[in-house]
Amino acid sequence: LPDLVKAFGFPCINMAGFEADDVLCSLAVQFASEDVHAYLLTSDKDFSQVVGPNISILDEGKGGRRMGVSEVQDKLGVLPEQVVDLLALMGDSSDNIPGVPGVGPKTASTLLGQYGDLESVLGAAAEGLVKGKRGANLVEFAEDARLSKRLA
C-alpha cells in the first residue's frame, strides 16, 4: 500500500508505535489554521474528537458528507471535545475499549449532557446522584472507565 500511495504522489508517513488514526488526527490539528482547513476522510467516530472550526470529517460511509461540530453533535449527542469521554463510558468494540457495562451511546451522551465530562459523571455516581444499576456500575467500573478514556 505505501508504494501505491507514493505512486499517486501522496506522502506516506509511518510512525512506529502509533496507530494511523492518531497520526492523522495529530497532523490535522498541527496543520489546521485560519488559512488551512483540514478534511479527514473517514467513517471512524474516533476522529470526531478533533473536529472544530478548521477541521472537518468527510464521512465516507455517507457519500462524503461533511461533518463539522454541529453534525458531530447531531450524530453522537456530544460535542467533539466530549467524544473521548463518550467512548470511555460506552466503550468501542472496534478499538477494544471496554467502557462501563450497561452504558450505551444514549445513556453516555445523556450523562455527559448532564455532568459535562467523565470525571464529573463518575463523581456524581459516587455521590449517589446516578441511581440504580447504572450508578452502581459507574462506581464499580470507575477505574475501567478511566482506562477506557486513556485508550480512546
Regions found by a protein language model. Give the residues of each.
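Extended two-metal-dependent nuclease catalytic cores across DNA- and RNA-processing enzymes
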Residues: L1-A152
